[in-house]
């Protein structure tokens, strides 16, 4: 019976296994050859392939079509990984599987970077392959052994008879799947990863890296949660009276592009940001854990005070599992001091599961796109100026409780290569003409000027209130502009931040202090005396 099962299946199984390694040659960065990988990584690859082959066999009972189906799925992941690496300098990782459903819900945020024609071709090609496989390859039948008889040929009275000849087929297929699963699990326990996506992919290969990352994500995070900085933080014995309002602007794709392109962009596009820096409590370049996207990495690092090194697998999407179980953050800490904690993001509240996650992180309220139905847009998203006006109204209408508002802007999200650029935009942001391949930079700089206008508006209105307040502005990551970077060079990847207070403005300006986004929250709170100093911070704002 075993021979009858394996003889017709062994050729497609082995052909598919070899091709599954061959497809990885298309990856960027390219993994090392299979014979140079750790034995455990090879075991995971063979185990996953065996499991997938068995499942396809059980589903379609067409071995060659099953092989083609698995390889097509693998090829799709390879293409997505390469598109991601091209735009974000990072290959596909296990938490990214969630983005397949997000791409259906929010196609504008994803499909432009994969390519609309590529997506249509992939869908159409898979549909054609599905039809061809089902139409051209016969189902495994009694010719390979009476126990392989198909359902279509089985008499109706034996359809649910455990002694019917089809039962051994599924029993053997299940045994094959189980052997693949056991091999993958056993080898996976010996597969070590460093959580540097490119390095792990090159060293282990695609299947082994994805399996290892998935296994790590399923491990308990209780110890990580207990070690969270805000789980053990202590408030100062004496707090400012009154407590200052705290405004944090997490600005989409914000960085001082003049630093990267000093001779190309007009210096006045960030005039208000320069003014804030000249009066700042602290300012400088900000090291963030994202390039071009993945806002929640920077967002969670600020809220939690935890960098990627501490988060392990959760650094890639902390809202996917870790934050969904609750986590002490700056919001929960400020809430314990009596603050009303609010997050404002003019986009769909369910994106990144923020509607479920943010309350668990200590926010009293999360305000999404529903509050901005009539707001002015710049491009497809709510404009930064309209968002700034909303924040000012919140400050003006707040109750006796001090307010902590964390604002996540959306205007400069992109895709920039889909935006229209007119001659007025060129004159507003450029010192000299740019090559046609750099039109994305013009669109980006236009939104950068709008963000700067919002900052100037906030500064003016906050000063008019004559109430203590502290403003923190930082960029979540640099923008996605691959054609610009290829033509005139790419930035380093750091963004910028500024901390500005109403009570202590330094007319002469202070020297820049570069820091990481995980450290920024400590700097921010320490300057207000709301937190016992963590490390050395040379400046403090006295609101008394």
Predicted regions located by residue number:
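Membrane-interface segments at or immediately adjacent to transmembrane helices
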Residues: 180-250, 259-262, 266
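Helix-boundary/low-complexity linker signature
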Residues: 14, 43, 243, 255-259, ...
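Residue-level preference for non-acidic, small/hydrophobic
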Residues: 103, 246-252, 407
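Short, glycine/acidic-enriched capping/hinge loops at junctions between secondary-structure elements
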Residues: 29-33, 258-262, 418, 484-485
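Short hydrophobic "helix-edge" motifs at membrane interfaces and signal-peptide entry regions
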Residues: 51, 241-243, 465-467
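Transmembrane and membrane-interface helices of multi-pass
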Residues: 1-202
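Short alpha-helical segments and helix-capping/turn motifs at coil-helix boundaries
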Residues: 53-54, 230-235, 326-329, 390-391
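Solvent-exposed soluble domains appended to multi-pass membrane proteins
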Residues: 251, 267-544
């Amino acid at each position: 019976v075993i021979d009858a099962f394996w003889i017709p299946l062994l050729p497609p199984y082995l052909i598919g296994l070899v091709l599954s390694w061959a497809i990885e040659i298309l990856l960027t960065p390219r993994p090392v050859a299979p014979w140079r990988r750790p034995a455990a990584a090879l075991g995971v690859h063979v185990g996953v392939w065996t499991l997938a082959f068995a499942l396809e066999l059980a589903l379609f009972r067409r071995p060659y079509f099953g092989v083609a189906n698995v390889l097509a799925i693998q090829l799709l992941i390879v293409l997505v990984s390469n598109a991601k690496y091209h735009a974000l300098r990072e290959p596909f990782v296990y938490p990214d599987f969630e983005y397949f459903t997000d791409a259906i819900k929010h196609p504008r945020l994803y499909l432009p970077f994969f390519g609309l024609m590529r997506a249509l071709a992939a869908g159409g090609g898979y549909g054609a392959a599905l039809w061809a496989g089902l139409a051209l390859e016969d189902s495994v039948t009694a010719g390979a052994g009476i126990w392989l008889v198909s359902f279509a040929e089985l008499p109706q009275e034996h359809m649910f008879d455990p002694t019917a000849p089809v039962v051994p087929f599924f029993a053997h297929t299940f045994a094959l799947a189980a052997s693949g699963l056991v091999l993958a699990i056993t080898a996976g326990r010996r597969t070590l990863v460093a959580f540097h996506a490119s390095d792990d992919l090159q060293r282990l290969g695609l299947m082994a890296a994805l399996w290892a990352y998935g296994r790590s994500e399923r491990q308990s995070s209780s110890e990580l949660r207990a070690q969270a900085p805000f789980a053990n933080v202590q408030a100062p014995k004496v707090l400012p009276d009154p407590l200052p309002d705290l405004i944090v602007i997490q600005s989409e794709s914000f960085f001082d592009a003049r630093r990267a392109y000093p001779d190309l962009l007009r210096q006045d596009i960030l005039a208000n940001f320069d003014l804030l820096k000249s009066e700042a409590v602290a300012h400088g370049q900000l090291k963030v854990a994202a390039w071009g996207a993945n806002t929640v990495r920077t967002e969670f690092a600020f809220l939690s005070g935890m960098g990627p090194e501490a988060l392990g697998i959760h650094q890639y999407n902390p809202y996917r599992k870790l934050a969904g179980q609750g986590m002490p953050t700056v919001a929960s800490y400020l809430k314990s001091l009596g603050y009303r904690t609010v997050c404002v993001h003019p986009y769909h509240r369910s994106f990144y599961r923020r509607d479920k996650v943010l309350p668990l992180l200590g926010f009293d309220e999360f305000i999404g796109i529903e509050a901005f139905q009539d707001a002015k847009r710049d491009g497809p998203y709510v404009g930064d100026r309209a968002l700034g006006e909303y924040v000012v109204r919140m400050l003006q209408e707040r109750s006796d409780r001090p307010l902590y508002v964390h604002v996540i802007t959306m205007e400069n999200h992109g895709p920039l290569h889909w935006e229209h650029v007119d001659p007025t935009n060129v004159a507003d942001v450029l010192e000299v003409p740019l090559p046609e391949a750099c039109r994305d930079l013009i669109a980006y700089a236009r939104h950068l000027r709008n963000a700067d206008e919002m900052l100037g508006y906030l500064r003016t209105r906050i000063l008019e209130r004559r109430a203590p307040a502290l403003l923190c502005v930082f960029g979540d990551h640099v923008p996605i502009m691959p054609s610009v970077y290829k033509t005139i060079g790419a930035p380093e990847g750091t963004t910028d931040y500024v901390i500005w207070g109403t009570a202590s403005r330094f007319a002469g300006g202070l020297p820049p202090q570069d820091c990481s986004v995980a450290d920024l929250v400590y700097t921010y709170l320490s300057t207000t005396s709301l937190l016992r100093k963590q490390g050395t911070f040379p400046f403090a704002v006295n609101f008394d």
